[in-house]
Amino acid sequence: MPYDSVYSEKRPPGTLRTAWRKFYSDASAMVGLYGCAGLAVLCIFGGWFAPYGIDQQFLGYQLLPPSWSRYGEVSFFLGTDDLGRDVLSRLLSGAAPTVGGAFVVTLAATICGLVLGTFAGATHGLRSAVLNHILDTLLAIPSLLLAIIVVAFAGPSLSHAMFAVWLALLPRMVRSIYSMVHDELEKEYVIAARLDGASTLNILWFAVMPNITAGLVTEITRALSMAILDIAALGFLDLGAQLPSPEWGAMLGDALELIYVAPWTVMLPGAAIMISVLLVNLLGDGVRRAIIAGVE
């Protein structure tokens, strides 16, 4: 009796599976993923992990070096500052105002930028031209300078600094999304979809948005890195979070005069800012490469 040999058809992996395989095989992307996950945990639970209070002072233990130093104490792993406060506790608690604040600012700028940029990219004529010239004018001003101007009028505080950074990031985000949407709408597949009777909303949601995801991830990564640096810079200039806040930029500015006496009080907050920006960029680049591989 003859037997029919039936072979199951091998299905190619889907877009998400292909993107995840590409992301998982990228070592730098996984480092960024785990690092950003650690930053998220610190933003939420950093105050609970801190062994001491952020304002708790220990008399007689001022300017102790880190514990691995010859004159360090095990009780103060990263040493103390000029007021006898534990540096590790302040760094752990400072992740929320620096990285957490930057994440909130970036999320708000992304949402507003998506709405305004998509609307601007889908329109033509006078409205698009006016918005384009306004964005070009705002982009001519550096983001940090614009944030300093806003804080100078509003007053120094963390909330005002976050608003100023959001206001500085918004034109760049709107301009980038506007350019991506405008370029996609000029392509042939969009024209074909319009000829088939697809509405503008369907074209934007089902055709344009999936094709600008990689560029959008790049812009979000850049915006988050800029937000971390700008919030820290405003704190360093005493225009953002005010002491005794453990915000990393404020810690860096407060300890600047101790750089020759106690260099760890300057190097540790600066290293925290640098590592945070590096991890965000590693994650963003990995996600962008994975999305491109999945789409292709």
From Swiss-Prot:
GO BP: any one term: putrescine transport
Entry annotated with the keyword Electron transport: no
CC annotations in GO: ATP-binding cassette (ABC) transporter complex, substrate-binding subunit-containing; membrane; plasma membrane
Signal peptide range in chain numbering: none
One example GO MF annotation: putrescine transmembrane transporter activity
InterPro entries recorded: BP-dependent_transpt_permease, MetI-like, MetI-like_sf, OppC_N
Cellular localization per UniProt: Cell inner membrane
Membrane topology: Multi-pass membrane protein
CDD domains in UniProt: TM_PBP2 (cd06261)
Main location, first listed in the record: membrane
Keyword presence, Repressor: no
All copies of domain ABC transmembrane type-1, residue ranges: 99-284
Transmembrane intervals: 29-49, 99-119, 134-154, 197-217, 223-243, 258-278
Gene ablation phenotype (knockout): Single mutation, decreased extracellular putrescine, in an sapBCDF operon deletion no change in resistance to antimicrobial peptide LL-37.
Functional summary from the UniProt entry: Part of a putrescine export transport system, does not play a role in resistance to antimicrobial peptides.
Record family assignment: Belongs to the binding-protein-dependent transport system permease family. OppBC subfamily.
Protein name as it appears in the record: Putrescine export system permease protein SapC
